[in-house]
From Swiss-Prot:
The chain crosses the membrane at residues 83-103, 130-150, 217-237, 254-274, 282-302, 336-356, 364-384, 403-423, 455-475, 481-501, 502-522, 537-557. GO terms for cellular component: nucleus; plasma membrane. Residues 104-129, 238-253, 303-335, 385-402, 476-480, 523-536 are extracellular. The keyword Cell membrane applies. Residues 1-82, 151-216, 275-281, 357-363, 424-454, 558-827 are cytoplasmic. This is Putative potassium transporter 12. It comes from Arabidopsis thaliana (Mouse-ear cress).
Length: 827
């Protein structure tokens, strides 16, 4: 890597001045036809020597097959709405292995935890606890998620960040001010805006956009939900594996607590150690194993109902809940913390929506998961009416003796699959947070060439493993882990309730009565459960709160520092007046080649460009300001990836390229492919720009009423991204042919010397090579900042920047073609 490490002072930055955002681009400066090409300049007596070798790197030609390989099938969105019934059934079967593993393993420990707090003294205790479990599953997973929350998806994507991005599209609540009107041209972005007739929706939108504290509260809410999901990634493996292994305590002599802890740790280490290989090779086994597990639960439940006490179906009467609380009072309130464990993993129904479809998840839950879980809990309750002393290990005691070992093996596999699903969900959640600028940059490894969603984040993986081992080693009991588990689960559910309510009011424009019923009903139930689990803070409930606080702090500091850094870059932009004073030579020598200057600005010229002009003795003939931008949509179609604009007059040969990605997009294209696509799209932009100029000159001879229609058509076309442009509709083409004779436009295009000059200059610069110009920046708080801001920026944010992935590695650019300049941002 070749670097120019120059410590940039504020003075050197100010020398290039600041400019008004109203003059971002200057168009209309005609190219002087007498100006020679760079090849002609090269023949003169200029000796560039080592300088040219440093600034120019010859790129390898990209194979066209590589370009076609980037067109990933299905990356344009979810085409799962009109699937046949048979296909939907197949997808529903697959959801069993990914979505419902966590909820499916809950019968291992729910009643054990409930009756550790409420001793069984009579039949009312068993029926009351069973009734609580039944209606908890019916209200939260069935009524809330299946019938309401799943519909609040973002183009088929679910989860906390999907809801946040959906809200960001309807109201400008993103704290990073890099939104552009052109983003709304993305096919997956375009949605129906709140209608003017509904003043309520517009009022909420205006309040969210104008009041900074509401933006901050919304961001904190989303980050809290994300932190709780990461906490689930720690607690789910520990809880599931320990619960499955606890079956050996009563079956194998000498298998005590120490053996349980050690065996659980061994399985956890093995589970996290194989993450780097991905789940593609064994993923096909997940659904069959979980299907076998669910049908085993249902079969064992039916067996126990028929053998012990079929009358426990009386628990379908909710009056037994009232009797349960009247009889046990405070102990019953404490038992709610164990009851909530029956819906662990309910959030996965929404978070994993992107891999399946709404209909398939609904079908799997209503037809398989829900009835099998009810039968399992009813069967355990029937067994407890005859054997109340077996509450400590009710699941394995209720299994027929002859089936113990087969069920134990299936339970262990189901626990590992449930843990795997939560670990994968944590990886995906962290990746989405990184894409939206809320998490430090980390190395992401894609473990599958066929499925773009399978990723592996080494730092997060080993962190989760260490935390799981600590949780198992410290608590040594599923009862104490359950106290922590409940807080994390309820916290995530309450966040989704608030966000879905906001979606109802802002986007769906639901009737105000129905919209308020949602938080009143489900929010009240979740609040009751939250108050119940919070009473267990001293008994293990503090663990998820510590994890959530830690990750919330990290994510908010990173977002806060990133926003301040972006605002500093906006303030220090180079003015257009200064660029005009420099002239087309930019006050230095322009040599053949293309300089790709990476920056975060979507408007204006970044101050780091002035630093390169001061530092380098020459600059490339073509400069492209490249901005990698994540927009609040799941995926951006490949043909809509690049957006080009011209910067400065034409003879400057400077452009802005915004490469747009969704928060679910995978940036793993080869640098050569990226370069080829970028150059191709730039050529198309130049041709479209010349076409627009030709149209403007031709339209002057036509009727204004007819011209305005055609002008709008072409203007919309030019505003769209320029790779593999979709063909316009036939009516539009017919209209254009009526208004504008194709012969006149075509002849003017062919005879345009300015276009031929620019294309020749671009091809010559491409042949000379591409160089990546990067900023190696440091962020510091201003001297007059308050103490807290200095502490956060100069120490915490600086620590995160030093230890996160470097910009060059994160941008996936070739290291041999890099020039870096140092710079300090004062915020």
């Amino acid at each position: 890597m070749e670097e120019i490490e120059e410590g940039s002072s504020n003075n050197s930055i100010r020398r290039v001045g600041t400019g008004s955002s109203d003059r971002r681009w200057v168009d209309g400066s005609e190219v002087d036809s007498e100006t020679p090409l760079f090849s002609e300049i090269r023949d003169r007596d200029y000796s560039f020597g080592n300088l040219r070798r440093r600034l120019m790197k010859k790129p390898k030609r990209a194979d066209s097959l590589d370009v076609e390989a980037m067109e990933i099938a299905g990356s344009h969105g979810h085409n799962l709405k009109d699937l046949s019934l048979l296909t939907t059934l197949g997808i529903a079967f697959q959801t069993l292995g990914v979505v419902y593993g966590d909820m499916g393993t809950s019968p291992l420990y729910v009643f054990s935890d409930v009756f550790s707090k409420v001793p069984i003294r009579s039949e009312v205790d068993v029926l009351g606890a069973l009734s609580l479990v039944i209606y908890t599953i019916a209200v939260i997973p069935l009524a809330k998620y299946v019938f309401v929350v799943l519909k609040a998806n973002d183009n088929g994507e679910g989860g906390t960040f999907a809801l946040y991005s959906l809200i960001c599209r309807y109201a400008k609540v993103n704290k990073l001010p890099n939104q552009q009107p052109a983003d709304e041209q993305i096919s997956s972005f375009r949605l129906k805006l709140p209608t003017p007739e509904l003043e309520r929706a517009l009022g909420i939108k205006e309040a969210l956009e104008t009041k900074g504290y509401l933006k901050t509260l919304l961001l904190l809410l989303v980050l809290m939900g994300t932190s709780m999901i990461i906490g689930d990634g720690i607690l789910t493996p520990a809880m599931s594996v320990m619960s499955a292994m606890s079956g050996l305590q009563g079956e194998v002599k000498g298998f005590g607590t120490n053996a349980l802890v050690m065996s659980s740790i061994v399985i956890l280490v093995a589970l996290f150690s194989i993450q780097r290989f991905g789940t593609g090779k064994v993923g096909f086994l997940f659904a069959p194993v979980l299907a076998l597990w669910f049908f085993s639960l249902g079969a064992i439940g039916i067996y126990n109902l028929l053998k012990y006490d079929f009358t426990v179906i009386r628990a379908l009467n909710p009056f037994y809940i009232v009797l349960f609380f009247n009889k046990n009072s405070k102990q019953a309130w404490s038992a709610l913390g164990g009851c909530v464990l029956c819906i662990t993993g309910a959030e996965a129904m929404f978070a994993d929506l992107g891999h399946f479809s709404v209909r398939s998840i609904q079908m799997a839950f209503t037809c398989v998961v829900f009835p099998c879980l009810l039968l399992a809990y009813m069967g355990q309750a029937a067994y407890l009416t005859k054997h109340p002393e077996a509450s400590a290990r009710i699941f394995y005691d209720s299994v027929p003796k002859s089936l113990f070992w087969p069920v134990f093996v299936i339970a262990t596999l189901a626990a590992m699959i449930a843990s795997q699903a939560m670990i994968s969900a944590t990886f995906s959640c962290v990746k989405q947070a990184m894409a939206l600028g809320c998490f430090p940059r980390l190395k992401i490894i894609h473990t599958s060439k066929k499925r773009i969603g399978q990723i592996y984040i080494p730092v997060i993986n080993w962190f989760l493993m260490i935390m799981c081992i600590l949780v198992v080693s410290i608590f040594r009991s599923t009862t104490h882990i359950a106290n922590a588990y409940g807080i994390a689960e309820v916290g995530v559910m309450m966040v989704s309730t608030v966000l879905v309510t906001l979606v109802m009011l802002l986007i769906w424009q639901t009737n105000i009565f129905l919209a308020l019923c949602f938080p009143l009903i489900f929010g009240s139930v979740e609040t009751i459960y939250l108050l119940a689990v919070l009473t267990k803070i001293l008994e293990g409930g503090w663990v998820p709160l510590v994890f959530a606080t830690f990750f919330l702090t990290v994510m908010y500091i990173w977002n806060y520092g990133s926003v301040l850094k972006y605002q500093s870059e906006v303030r220090e932009r180079i003015s257009m007046d200064f660029m005009r004073e420099l002239g087309s030579t930019l006050g230095t020598i322009r040599i053949p080649g293309i300089g790709l200057l990476y920056n975060e600005l979507v408007q204006g010229i970044p101050s780091i460009f002035g630093q390169f002009l001061l530092t380098l003795p020459a600059i490339h003939s073509t400069i492209i300001f490249v901005c990698i931008k994540y927009v609040p949509v799941p995926v951006v179609p490949q043909e809509e990836r690049f957006l080009f604009r011209r910067v400065c007059p034409k003879d400057y040969h400077m452009f802005r390229c915004i490469a747009r990605y969704g928060y679910k997009d995978v940036r793993k294209e080869d640098s050569r492919v990226f370069e080829q696509l970028l150059i191709e799209s730039l050529e198309k932009f130049l041709r479209c720009e010349a076409l627009e100029d030709a149209l403007e000159s031709t339209l002057n001879d036509f009727d204004p009423d007819r011209v305005s229609v055609a002008s709008d058509t072409y203007t919309d076309d030019l505003m769209a991204p320029l790779i593999h442009r979709a063909k316009r509709s036939e009516p539009e083409q017919e209209l254009d042919s009526e208004v504008l004779p194709s012969s006149s436009v075509g002849s003017s295009m062919e005879e345009d010397p300015a276009l031929e000059y620019e294309l020749a200059a671009l091809r010559e610069a491409t042949d000379s090579g591409l160089t990546y110009l990067l900023a190696h920046g440091d962020v510091r708080a201003k001297k007059n900042s308050i103490f807290v801001k200095k502490l956060v920026i100069n120490y915490f944010y600086a620590f995160l920047r030093r230890n996160c992935r470097a910009g060059a590695a994160n941008l996936t650019v070739p290291h041999m073609n890099i020039l870096q300049a140092g710079m300090t941002y004062m915020v």
